[in-house]
């Protein structure tokens, strides 16, 4: 009979359930995720900081629907073709390397010389006056390079994190290891968000712009572009360096660690069949015919749509208070730090919820958290005048931003700590073919379809009513929010039954 565990052994099991012999594999995987999530946090802030101050928060729905979604479809086709031609390791290098090259090109070539590439403001204003219903499309055309950067930043999340990293992890770990490894991987990886926020705050901190001094002349605009370039280039250089480190770690894991006797059973999953010959149409058909994969896709769609619906009004409020790119980056840097701290805390809690309370309870917590915090934000915005009359001279705009930030932080913390882990565990019982090609289609297309569906609803309103803003359509967004939360919870209940059967 084994002796009872001491208090410190129990604490270690809660916070760090990784065995010593597993550290050789776990540490490089965790560092790799840290680098990838560092880039995710930095890129997420940069893309919003470029498009929201220059074109308005309403433009995000158009970017997600008309640029990001088609790009995801094209990339899925490209990924399937690459995976049929090369093994997974080389596909990883090709894809990540392509992203890093673009980020360098944008920071050092496109952005500093944008005046030479973008149309004249007088032409753009004239077109908007002539065609008011298409003003958002005209604005995208006026800042096309920002739109391109937005696409690549969005795809980093869908492709490098959701598809490449997690697919690699799913090949290596079985269900039992995943319960211990995934929450802790996420906990270590989310330190990358804290580091990303710190980098953003550091490089934007000495360039804060007074809103009253925003440029009204061409010379002032060029000067502001120069200051933003000085902030952007070192940040992008660090992003590229983190990407290169992640590729080196991936190489070490494949060539040195997975060949060890300790990990030989895991490595067989990766090396046994890295190339699955399957056409694009066959891949899509495979997903459509699998009800189980369809339920996973619905989870992702619900989350993406709900986040899109809540984030738009919040980012519109942030722009009102921080109208320049540099100020916006600085705010988002501080937001990233708080997000990272919250995510790490939730990861510690989430790892124990997942191991002790199981898949079903863990999968339900994210929609419950999102519903509570989302309703708080909508109620605050809808009744902001009534709330303001109760608190006198209180800064309502700042308060709205804080409430929205709390909603964003708590809902995404539960998403990163529990939703991602439970979603990835749902793939593990599947066959290698369905797990690989099905995941590719679900993660890339499914992730963006959810956000694009929310974007379609919003953009349709903005096209039909050119004068509409997030403030004027907030009540309709609340109704959609309640319907989608209910659908999400129903889908978790149904998926749990099938997942339990497959794991038997």
UniProtKB/Swiss-Prot annotation:
<dbReference type="GO" id="GO:0005886">
    <property type="term" value="C:plasma membrane"/>
</dbReference>
<keyword id="KW-0067">ATP-binding</keyword>
<dbReference type="GO" id="GO:0005471">
    <property type="term" value="F:ATP:ADP antiporter activity"/>
</dbReference>
<feature type="transmembrane region" description="Helical">
    <location>
        <begin position="386"/>
        <end position="406"/>
    </location>
</feature>
<feature type="transmembrane region" description="Helical">
    <location>
        <begin position="59"/>
        <end position="79"/>
    </location>
</feature>
<feature type="transmembrane region" description="Helical">
    <location>
        <begin position="296"/>
        <end position="316"/>
    </location>
</feature>
<dbReference type="GO" id="GO:0005524">
    <property type="term" value="F:ATP binding"/>
</dbReference>
<feature type="transmembrane region" description="Helical">
    <location>
        <begin position="473"/>
        <end position="493"/>
    </location>
</feature>
<keyword id="KW-0472">Membrane</keyword>
<feature type="transmembrane region" description="Helical">
    <location>
        <begin position="90"/>
        <end position="110"/>
    </location>
</feature>
<feature type="transmembrane region" description="Helical">
    <location>
        <begin position="329"/>
        <end position="349"/>
    </location>
</feature>
<feature type="transmembrane region" description="Helical">
    <location>
        <begin position="23"/>
        <end position="43"/>
    </location>
</feature>
<dbReference type="Pfam" id="PF03219">
    <property type="entry name" value="TLC"/>
</dbReference>
<keyword id="KW-0812">Transmembrane</keyword>
<keyword id="KW-0813">Transport</keyword>
<keyword id="KW-0547">Nucleotide-binding</keyword>
<comment type="similarity">
    <text>Belongs to the ADP/ATP translocase tlc family.</text>
</comment>
<comment type="function">
    <text>Provides the rickettsial cell with host ATP in exchange for rickettsial ADP. This is an obligate exchange system. This energy acquiring activity is an important component of rickettsial parasitism.</text>
</comment>
<dbReference type="InterPro" id="IPR004667">
    <property type="entry name" value="ADP_ATP_car_bac_type"/>
</dbReference>
<protein>
    <recommendedName>
        <fullName>ADP,ATP carrier protein 3</fullName>
    </recommendedName>
</protein>
<feature type="transmembrane region" description="Helical">
    <location>
        <begin position="364"/>
        <end position="384"/>
    </location>
</feature>
<feature type="transmembrane region" description="Helical">
    <location>
        <begin position="146"/>
        <end position="166"/>
    </location>
</feature>
<feature type="transmembrane region" description="Helical">
    <location>
        <begin position="449"/>
        <end position="469"/>
    </location>
</feature>
<keyword id="KW-1133">Transmembrane helix</keyword>
<feature type="transmembrane region" description="Helical">
    <location>
        <begin position="230"/>
        <end position="250"/>
    </location>
</feature>
<feature type="transmembrane region" description="Helical">
    <location>
        <begin position="183"/>
        <end position="203"/>
    </location>
</feature>
<keyword id="KW-1003">Cell membrane</keyword>
